[in-house]
């Protein structure tokens, strides 16, 4: 059923080659330069395990109420695509998939950032007031703006 899952996405074009953009997505250490959630908790605890980048690279965090707690793992990494398994443990439990699709265009790279996942009953009821689009959409927009700035100034 369509209402039992969600998909949100945002897109932008970045004046940088695909490989430069890919390098910022494929290495969780690089996310500190552009992630829209960076700065929610100045005392955020970060843990990196697995390879430094690419498939099986893992980033886990634990922070204040705003930052929450969770874990991300890169599950696919190809020249024009990076997929991430995203598990939130707090403040709300959720298991989502994040995809970055990179398309070469004249003068740079077109980037689509999407997030998909199931919506439990509570999320569907909350959706009557606050949709995932409204909750997460602005974060994706902010992240793409910061990714663009970071890639273009590298």
Enumerate the predicted regions with their spans:
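Short, surface-exposed coil-to-beta transition loops
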Residues: 7-9, 67-72, 93-98
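Beta-strand/loop substructures that line and gate deep hydrophobic ligand-binding cavities in soluble
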Residues: 81-142, 147-149, 153
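A residue-level detector for short acidic-glycine micro-motifs
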Residues: 74-76, 104
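A generic structural micro-feature
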Residues: 2-4, 51-53, 64-66, 90-94, ...
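Hydrophobic ligand-binding cavity/cleft-lining segments
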Residues: 1-52
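Short hydrophobic interaction/assembly module
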Residues: 57-74
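Short, hydrophobic/aromatic-rich segments at coil-to-beta transitions
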Residues: 52-60, 77-85
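Hydrophobic pocket/interface hotspot
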Residues: 20-31, 59, 74, 84, ...
């Amino acid at each position: 059923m369509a209402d039992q899952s969600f998909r949100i996405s945002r897109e932008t074009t970045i004046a940088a080659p695909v490989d430069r953009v890919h390098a910022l997505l494929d290495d969780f250490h690089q996310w500190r330069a552009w992630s829209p959630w960076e700065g929610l908790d100045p005392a955020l605890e970060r843990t990196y395990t697995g390879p430094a980048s690419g498939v099986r690279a893992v980033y886990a965090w634990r922070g204040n109420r705003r930052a929450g707690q969770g874990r991300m793992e890169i599950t696919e990494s190809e020249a024009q695509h990076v997929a991430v398994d995203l598990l939130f443990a707090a403040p709300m439990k959720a298991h989502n998939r994040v995809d970055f699709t990179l398309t070469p265009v004249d003068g740079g790279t077109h980037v689509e950032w999407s997030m998909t996942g199931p919506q439990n009953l509570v999320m569907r009821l909350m959706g009557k007031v606050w949709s995932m689009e409204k909750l997460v959409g602005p974060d994706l927009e902010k992240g793409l703006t910061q990714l663009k700035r970071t890639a273009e100034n590298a």
